[in-house]
Amino acid sequence: LGLGHTRWATHGEPSDVNSHPQVSESGRFAVVHNGIIENYMELREFLQSEGITFVSQTDTEVVAQLLEHYYDGDILDAVVKTLNRIQGAYALGIVCADCPDRLIAARKDSPLILGYGEGAHYLASDVTALIKYTREVCYLDDGEIAELTADHLWVYDAYLRPVEKERCHVDWEISAAEKGGYEHFMAKEIMEQPEAFRKTVFPRIQEGRVVLDELNLEPDYLRELDKLYVIACGSSYHVGMAAKYTLERLLRKPVEVTLASEFRYCDPIVTDKTLVLVISQSGETVDTLAALREAKRLGARVLSIVNVVGSTIARESDDVLYTWAGPEIAVATTKAFSTQLAVVYLIGLYCAEALGTLDEAEYDRIVSELLLIPTKLEQILDNRADIQYFASLYFNHPSIFFIGRNIDYAIGMEGSLKLKEISYIHSEAYAAGELKHGTISLIEPGTLVVALASYVTVSYTHLTLPT
């Protein structure tokens, strides 16, 4: 039996003492935890009043100490009592010295996947960690508890009543979770974009028409829609920004875009005549999942774009379109971003045909362009000499600004985020027309400004901005 976790330092500095697993005072319990225990200070003070000594600054140690506090020989009973005390998001892996052949798992608002093997069972927060060992998995739902041994796997609800779980088969190849000769995963995944695009788009275009058998959006339903609402986080939010420009142009319907983390706090105007488009690579993004549930509570129909089959967002959506990008292991998204954009266009074309809002010539032109994109991506990626040359010119710049109009603004936002994530260079993105409204005061001689001008109808004005 093994237990490990790569920890983001949300509580306490990165150090050995704050690393996982966290262990109870007696050493009986060891815990790994993904998430945040919101009431950990209150629980810590309670346990200290009971005479328990803490050695770390983590919220996770509170879980281990609570398990010890409630343990009377029944590990599952101690787990239930502990879960009833903690508030927040968690995916937990728990071992007890008294039961060395058992691993206990529990989740709330944080993904947890179980893997089925021969003479072994597995637990992970991401399915990519499992595909070296098994392709048969199931996804724990909120409030569920799992008990794993080498030979058996049981799942219970919050009252320890048995739960039957549906198995999912993961089609990803083992090689997809390996670097394949590249220095790091991001470089590999950048180079995989053309093939990911082909797998996502080509099977869905048949004889020049977009065919989305996964959807059942009737023309009458689409005509009755008052608007579309896009919800996402991070890079997926930038896809949502691009979706606004694209879908409004193709469907002639208003499109709103909101960060998932803000959706529940902005009193959204959503009804049963609103189609909510949820975008998430993992299908487990906590804020996005919470926003999805709120949208459904308000009566909206939810269509999701996700990359992981069987993920929570996919299961809870009314309709789902998968991006067949394969596992994306690098923190910074690449091929998932590209394929999400592709699916947005497929949705736009599919709905535009049903609504009759796009003339045949324009429909054919967009389809033809979509089919050419993988080849164009390959041409760009093959041009490594120029890419290296420009990188060598600009890597020392302290600040880099991205500007663009329409969809170029959305892509500029993603470019700026990528630069910050990967190079730690300060970067911001602005709508090109807003450059003169205060932003220009940040630009000095030598400041690098990256201007995106691919959107033909505005590129001329864009390029003639004052410099």
Where are the language model's segments positioned?
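Conserved short alpha-helical segments that host acidic/polar catalytic motifs at enzyme active sites
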Residues: 1-179, 183-184, 195-226, 238, ...
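Glycine-rich oxoanion-binding loops at beta->alpha junctions
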Residues: 6-17, 208-219, 244-279, 426-441
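Short, solvent-exposed amphipathic alpha-helical segments in soluble enzyme
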Residues: 19-21, 49, 108-111, 139, ...
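Short glycine/serine/threonine-rich phosphate/pyrophosphate-binding segments
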Residues: 40, 236-242, 284-291, 313, ...
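Short acidic loop-to-helix transition motifs that present clustered carboxylates
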Residues: 62, 87-88, 130, 257-266, ...
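Phosphate/diphosphate-binding loops
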Residues: 129, 135-149, 276, 280-315, ...
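Active-site phosphate/pyrophosphate-binding segments
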Residues: 193-197, 201-229, 319-448, 458
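Conserved small/polar residues in nucleotide/adenosyl-binding loops
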Residues: 461-467
